[in-house]
Amino acid sequence: MPKKSIEEWEEDAIESVPYLASDEKGSNYKEATQIPLNLKQSEIENHPTVKPWVHFVAGGIGGMAGAVVTCPFDLVKTRLQSDIFLKAYKSQAVNISKGSTRPKSINYVIQAGTHFKETLGIIGNVYKQEGFRSLFKGLGPNLVGVIPARSINFFTYGTTKDMYAKAFNNGQETPMIHLMAAATAGWATATATNPIWLIKTRVQLDKAGKTSVRQYKNSWDCLKSVIRNEGFTGLYKGLSASYLGSVEGILQWLLYEQMKRLIKERSIEKFGYQAEGTKSTSEKVKEWCQRSGSAGLAKFVASIATYPHEVVRTRLRQTPKENGKRKYTGLVQSFKVIIKEEGLFSMYSGLTPHLMRTVPNSIIMFGTWEIVIRLLS
């Protein structure tokens, strides 16, 4: 066997690097994945290192953008969840299936269409009777809540995900790591922002009784009234339901991470391992749209699975009756009272406007979050 020169050995070694760097374990050299030598491991895994403050800022901006666009649907959802507006906005969808010989699936589709039509009708009525600005009632406290809530959520999730991965799984992410990080983020966010959401709910339900006199001049007046009449603990009404509601956020993060992983795997199958800088603009936009859409789909599934807690939380945050007595005093008690007096179906009151708000809200929020992260990183 003739001896190779140093140059020949060097050339063979360089040609073998892409094969050795890939995960291929087979013997077919030509099918080995070509990985650029200057590609960092973080870029290969599509988990670039992002500073915590970037998550904080990007989450706040994303949450603000989504909240402003979808505020009218949030107003309708809150009113439909409250028993104060129960008679005024009673849906006709429940009567569609009565005495009907149509298949259940057809009835469900018709009911969904009815809810959609009624939601738009309620928005129209609010606009006619209360004015355009009323469609954005509660936006102030909503933004005051959304911006820190999303900042805290994205910051805590991103930070604890990296921390848990390094502490428990040698830096590798798994669904269990995502679960732990999402739970931590959900509980931290709920505790920090519950007073803001309570004020926002009270303001949106104001001017809802038999009298047309407003109880609160503004959010600040509402805050002072709650502290004066109910004490500081009154600001944490509905916190137990918020903790229960963190399950929705946990489920959304889990689904989003798994769908994002599938999108990345399909990208690798099609293009191979590529650094983000080497992809064309159209490829980047397409993957961004897919990831944003995944956030919306994840929110859709999570919302349907966990929606009843939203109704209970709204009832717990309502202003006490004129005699000072609270109808809804606790999580379990509220579930029992609502189901007994209004039926199981009422646990999904306001679901249609909720989905019409949260799904596009998630798409806008996560999409904006990714854009801001790329700009700041």
Curated annotation (Swiss-Prot):
Its annotated compartments are: Mitochondrion inner membrane
The record ties this protein, via SUPFAM superfamilies, to:
Mitochondrial carrier
Q: Name one GO biological process term.
A: transmembrane transport
| Gene Ontology MF annotations | pyrimidine nucleotide transmembrane transporter activity
Q: Where are the Solcar repeats?
A: 50-163, 173-262, 286-375
Q: Which family does it belong to?
A: Belongs to the mitochondrial carrier (TC 2.A.29) family.
For this entry, the protein name equals Mitochondrial pyrimidine nucleotide transporter RIM2
Presence of the UniProt keyword RNA-binding in the record? no
Q: Which organism is it from?
A: Saccharomyces cerevisiae (strain ATCC 204508 / S288c)
Q: Which domain of life is it from?
A: Eukaryota
* PROSITE patterns linked to this entry: SOLCAR (PS50920)
Please provide the record's keywords in A-Z order: Membrane, Mitochondrion, Mitochondrion inner membrane, Repeat, Transmembrane, Transmembrane helix, Transport
Classification via InterPro entries: Mit_carrier, Mitochondrial_sb/sol_carrier, Mt_carrier_dom_sf, SLC25A33/36-like
Indicate whether Cell division appears among the record's keywords.
no
Membrane topology type: Multi-pass membrane protein
Task of the protein: Mitochondrial transporter that imports/exports pyrimidine nucleotides into and from mitochondria. Selectively transports uridine, thymidine, and cytosine (deoxy)nucleoside di- and triphosphates by an antiport mechanism. Also transports, with lower efficiency, uridine, thymidine, and cytosine (deoxy)nucleoside monophosphates as well as guanosine (deoxy)nucleoside di- and triphosphate.
Q: Which reaction is recorded as catalysed by this protein?
A: 5-methyl-UTP(out) + UTP(in) = 5-methyl-UTP(in) + UTP(out)
Principal subcellular localisation of the protein: mitochondrion
Traits of the deletion mutant: Causes total loss of mtDNA and lack of growth on non-fermentative carbon sources.
One GO location term (cellular component): mitochondrial inner membrane
Q: Where are the transmembrane segments?
A: 53-73, 131-151, 179-199, 238-258, 286-306, 347-368
Q: Which Pfam families match?
A: Mito_carr
The gene it comes from is RIM2
